[in-house]
Amino acid sequence: MILIDTNILIDLFAEDPDWKGRSLVAFRLAKSRDALAINDIVYAELAPGFPNVAELDAALAALDVAVVPTAKSALFLAGHVYQRYRRQQGTKLNVLPDFFIGAHAAVENAQLLTRDARRVKAYFPTVEVISP
């Protein structure tokens, strides 16, 4: 399974002129390698771009992207990584969605398709990143 970060799907759905082409190439490459999925955190981040659940589900189905729940072990890891971030003078006061997504990939030993390769590798060095 390859997990997809929100930024890649936003590039595709919003037709971002700067990133759509590169993200589409990376998406197609990932799809040729393994099944694609997002977790519930990514689903929530995508929701504001759609008028209802049915349309978001249809958009994901059209791309053959499954939605998988985030395991408790990934949530636990995300909390600990966030704590490390705060100790290193991180300014965000809540656990960042990127930590949930990266922790999910780490716990599932899944590759992660993302534009935030540097941040993922900094906090989740075992995660194999696919980046446009």
What do these predicted ranges mean?
Residues 2, 35-37, 64-69, 111:
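Short loop->beta-strand "edge-of-pocket" segments that line small-molecule binding or catalytic clefts
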Residues 51-73:
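Active-site-proximal, substrate-binding regions of enzyme catalytic domains
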Residues 32-33, 62-66, 108, 126:
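Structured helix-beta-strand junction loops
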Residues 8, 42, 74, 100-101, ...:
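Alpha-helix capping/helix-boundary segments
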Residues 66-111, 115:
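Active-site neighborhoods of divalent-metal-dependent phosphate/nucleic-acid chemistry enzymes
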Residues 4-5, 38-39, 94-95, 116-117:
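Histidine- and aromatic-rich ligand-binding microenvironments
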Residues 1, 28, 102-132:
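Acidic, PIN/NYN-like endoribonuclease modules and their adjacent C-terminal/linker elements
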Residues 1-38, 47-59, 130:
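Short, well-structured N-terminal submotif of metal-dependent ribonuclease cores
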